[in-house]
Amino acid sequence: MNKPVKMEPGVKLRDAAKMALIPVKVLPTEKNEMLRKPEWLKIRLPKSTERIEGIKQAMRKHGLHSVCEEASCPNLSECFNHGTATFMILGAICTRRCPFCDVAHGRPLTPDATEPEKLALTIKDMKLSYVVITSVDRDDLRDGGAQHFADCIREIRKHSPNITIEILVPDFRGRMDRALEILIETPPDVFNHNLETAPRLYKLARPGADYKWSLELLRRFKEAHPEIKTKSGLMVGLGEEISEIEEVLRDLRAHNVDMLTVGQYLQPSKHHLPVKRYVPPAEFDALKAYADEIGFTHAASGPFVRSSYHADQQAAGKEVK
């Protein structure tokens, strides 16, 4: 039997070190085993990086994190170049160790009580009209970090009263009652929680998470605030069948979820789960058509779509691919 790994607070475990701790063994994918990216997945970099560097400097100045950087999002250059970013609160170390995700695992530090104000002032300085706030999983906190979300929402509204706030929350495992009590009292404008994949793949891709629990979180928030949009996201290319994704879409609608994002899974490193298939654009279009047909108010479906990709346009009902 392996001895438990002693984790020091604040130390980030990534790639092989992180994968060594998950219950399902993931073998490294050698370069010759990786699927070749198709032409539709080639990213065009912007000519100027001035705006990108400006946002990175603003983050560093206030000790803030973006999920764009921490999760190695392929859209970072495009979003930063347009002056948008998804802020990640509660540190950059996650208590979970999902093998599709590039965010570091480890023992997080105590939440920074000054972060809500620093975040609000940064958002005000950036003159944002729409902001997405997400977090790592914080299973070490009694409320899963919900109060910190609420504090951030309150501070942002104080400094930017006309802003639209979307929060992308973890599942608050074992703490749903307390977390919802807090967030129902201090709600965002859009409540987002990602199901990520089909339930058959949860043990592989989302160890520690529960499909029905996540659906219930979305349902209960919507029940308390029917006027607020709820949203969820999925990735494809992990070995799921399209019929399984369609079933997830039906489950989301049955739980009154309004908005949907579907994007291609991209392997962050050779130590993460391998890409089983690159889904062609036509299949993304078909998933969007199906989502529209079954009643989503907005569905963004495309290879580069992520939860917060052009989130302002998604919320406004504009087509995003």
From Swiss-Prot:
Which keywords does UniProt give here?
4Fe-4S, Cytoplasm, Iron, Iron-sulfur, Metal-binding, S-adenosyl-L-methionine, Transferase
Q: In which pathway does it act?
A: Protein modification; protein lipoylation via endogenous pathway; protein N(6)-(lipoyl)lysine from octanoyl-[acyl-carrier-protein]: step 2/2
- Positions with a binding annotation for [4Fe-4S] cluster 2: 94, 98, 101
Q: Which InterPro entries match?
A: Aldolase_TIM, Elp3/MiaA/NifB-like_rSAM, LIAS_N, Lipoyl_synth, rSAM
Q: Where in the cell is it found?
A: Cytoplasm
Q: Which reaction does it catalyse?
A: [[Fe-S] cluster scaffold protein carrying a second [4Fe-4S](2+) cluster] + N(6)-octanoyl-L-lysyl-[protein] + 2 oxidized [2Fe-2S]-[ferredoxin] + 2 S-adenosyl-L-methionine + 4 H(+) = [[Fe-S] cluster scaffold protein] + N(6)-[(R)-dihydrolipoyl]-L-lysyl-[protein] + 4 Fe(3+) + 2 hydrogen sulfide + 2 5'-deoxyadenosine + 2 L-methionine + 2 reduced [2Fe-2S]-[ferredoxin]
Q: Which GO terms describe its molecular function?
A: 4 iron, 4 sulfur cluster binding; lipoate synthase activity; metal ion binding
Cofactor requirement: [4Fe-4S] cluster
User: What Pfam families does the annotation carry?
Assistant: LIAS_N, Radical_SAM
Q: Which HAMAP family match?
A: Lipoyl_synth
Name of the protein described by the UniProt record: Lipoyl synthase
Q: What is the lineage of its organism?
A: Bacteria, Pseudomonadati, Pseudomonadota, Gammaproteobacteria, Alteromonadales
